[in-house]
Amino acid sequence: MQSLSLNSSTLQSPSMALVLIRPETETTGSSTSSRALQEVIAQLAQELTHNGQLDESSPLGKLLGKAMAASGKAGGGLEDIKAALDTLIHEKLGDNFGASADNASDTGQHDLMTQVLNGLAKSMLNDLLTKQDDGTRFSEDDMPMLKKIAEFMDDNPAQFPKPDSGSWVNELKEDNFLDGDETAQFRSALDIIGQQLGSQQNAAGGLAGDSSGGGLGSPVSNTENSPGSLGDPLIDANTGPASNSNSNGDVGQLIGELIDRGLQSVLAGGGLGTPVSTANTALVPGGEQPNQDLGQLLGGLLQKGLEATLQDAGQTGTGVQSSAAQVALLLVNMLLQSTKNQAAA
């Protein structure tokens, strides 16, 4: 009876009850992730662990290290790394991410890993720039990813005109600040690559709770003022990138540019077809009365100019998107690469 009385007294003490309950909580864990997602987390944790501790030499390792330090788990072992990864994935990709993955096949398991890495890469893009005054600043820790973005911009000068430093890679070397115009250009690149990461993530199986595609939500352009979507090759070809002019525009100037473009195409050997040839013959001095008026000639040149513009715009858009898709894959592969391996690559 004395023993029963002692146990009852012990259990009535809040502090002692906490001591009794806490070890059980730590042992069982509190993850609500699906079994499939927990297996992915375990694989990632192994990749990020060196000598029993987190290796922070990779971009994902650095991100996880900051998260663990913020939660008081810096220097923790494998189980702490798993718990931090679990929390990070749900914070970045949604509470219900991977909820239906337990019903997936082995292929689905691989797809889930792809979704996790693409989703984390996309979220990291959104955190690369931090607002400061009338521009943004960036961290030296993020330089491996930033450099890939800058190289993408330098490879597509029609979409991203060179800054004063001569190249976007050089711009990153000058200091860790981008002014307003530079920030807009950089966020435009982030948005295009983010769309590719989102598309690749969705194509991997659509198991995530938040499967919405699109950009990063960064303020690349003001939708109230911009007449078209960001990076639309046809709009850029006609009005210039990120045009905020009135939607009516200067129609006369646009028509003049298209006619000039058509004339250049004809002189380059493109040809305008029979109607315009007839007009050219009829306009020779001393010839018969013209069979076509000047309007038909200008109409042919206008049509040819429009065709050339559309063709170039399509090639530009395809080139940028293809380049962005390649960079997106590179960024995903970089997540688990140490800084040393990145330098070798």
Curated annotation (Swiss-Prot):
Keywords: Host cell membrane, Host membrane, Hypersensitive response elicitation, Ion channel, Ion transport, Membrane, Repeat, Secreted, Transport, Virulence. Residues 202-247 are annotated as: Disordered. Residues 206-217 have a biased composition (Gly residues). The keyword Ribonucleoprotein does not apply. It is found in: Secreted; Host cell membrane. The keyword GTP-binding does not apply. Sequence repeats lie at residues 213-219, 269-275. Residues 86-194 are annotated as: Peptide-binding. Residues 219-228 have a biased composition (Polar residues). One of its GO terms (cellular component) is membrane. Pfam families: Harpin (PF04877). Transmembrane segments: none annotated. The glycine-rich region is characteristic of harpins. This is Harpin HrpZ.
